[in-house]
Amino acid sequence: FIRYGGEAVGLVHLGSRGGEIDWLEELFVLPEFQGRGIGTCAIGLAEKIVSAYSESFYIEAAARNEKAIRLYRKLGYDCLNTVTIRKDFHAERFETLSTERILDMDFQIKRYKE
């Protein structure tokens, strides 16, 4: 858990996929505590821990999560251009935000309907 002023305001979850492949599996900071450098501090601490035994540290972010991507870029992370592909079993629960062309295929960028 991430504590700020003695209060739990978020969490960090690190994971390892073997072979020195280490990931920030999850980072969450309560909305009312965002913008205070808490996430940046948490990532810095995670990097310090992981750098003691690994050569690199990976973070995944949804393409639509611009705020997170800007933070990770500011902290020195580069895009690997990986693609996560999903099959929706309940298409009616999603709405299409945009379409992206990858190679010669069109993919819909979706989110859960509110």
Task: Label the predicted regions.
Residues 23, 53-55, 76:
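Short loop/turn motifs at secondary-structure junctions
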Residues 25-26, 47, 60:
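Acidic-residue sensor for enzyme active/binding pockets
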Residues 50-62:
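Conserved GNAT acetyl-CoA-binding A-motif
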Residues 29, 35-48, 66, 70-74:
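Conserved acetyl-CoA-binding loop-helix of GNAT-fold acetyltransferases
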Residues 17, 49-53, 78:
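Alpha-helix C-cap/termination motif
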Residues 1-25, 30-31, 43, 79-84, ...:
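Acetyl-CoA-dependent GNAT
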Residues 59-69, 85-92:
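Conserved beta-strand-loop-alpha-helix junction that forms the acyl-donor binding cleft
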